Every structure is written in structure tokens, then in C-alpha cells.
Amino acid sequence: MTAIQNFFKTFFLTELLKGLALTGRYTFQRKVTVQFPEEKTPISPRFRGLHALRRYENGEERCIACKLCEAVCPALAITIESETRADNTRRTTRYDIDLTKCIFCGFCEESCPVDSIVETHILEYHGEKRGDLYFTKDMLLAVGDRYETEIAANKAADAPYR
């Protein structure tokens, strides 16, 4: 009996007609698709995108070379080298993040005691070569300087949940 039913379903194209009816029903309804490059959807305040290093208001970089972010990184994407200055404070001489290894978990941001390393809302970045996704200290500081107002606003919005 089922073989005969299957024959008539396929012979009279009932599945095809059901699919066309469904398509026709949704053709004239409001669209939910976003045309991405031209339209942007709202981003969560907790979105984790491109990394940035922040500075204090006086221009000095925040990183104290505690290396907690390097230790907590599960992907081993962060490399830090530091030196002790004349006033017995440590500062980084090298701070590199390999974004080809990074899984954007946010552990580096959570472990930083001085809020030096942050993940911004920047999601549109690319590289033509693998080396283009290897961010050095100067590149990370440049991102932080450029987007400091946005970073500070996002930190303030997220403050009640931290």
C-alpha cells in the first residue's frame, strides 16, 4: 500500500506543490534578512572582537607586564616580554597576539587587573596573508587609542555585571 501511495505522491508532485505553497505564503511577508555590508545589526555590549591595549589618561600604557593574560590564554596566542625600569616597575617590551590562534574567549580581558587588554566591537578586519593577523604591541596600542571612547563606554555599560 505504501508503495502505491509513494508513487502517486511523486507522480502528482504533491511535495513540490507543498513547497511552492510555503514559498508563496512567505513571499509577501516582512523580510527578516539583513543586507550585511549596508545594514548592520546591533551588537551586544559583551561582544568580543579585535583586541586593543589601553592607556591611562596621562598617555602611559596600562599594561604592568604581570603576564596573567599570557598564562590564562588557552590557545597560547599571547606572547609577552618585559623589562624592569629604573623605578622598579615592569613594562612590556613585546606584546603580541596571534589572531590565527585566538579563540576570542575573553579570558585575557577578565584576568587583566588593570583593564589593559580589552576586546573591542570591531568585527570587520581581514588579512591577505597569515602574518597580517599577527598584532604587535604598537598595533594593539593604535587600536586602543583610536577606539578609546567606545571602549570606555562599553566598559561603563558592562560595569554592573562585572
UniProtKB/Swiss-Prot annotation:
Protein's recorded name: NADH-quinone oxidoreductase subunit I
Keyword Iron: yes
Entry's family note: Belongs to the complex I 23 kDa subunit family.
Subcellular location: Cell inner membrane
The EC number(s) this enzyme carries: 7.1.1.-
Reaction(s) the record says it catalyses: a quinone + NADH + 5 H(+)(in) = a quinol + NAD(+) + 4 H(+)(out)
The organism of origin for this protein: Paraburkholderia xenovorans (strain LB400)
Residues the record lists as binding [4Fe-4S] cluster 1: C63, C66, C69, C112
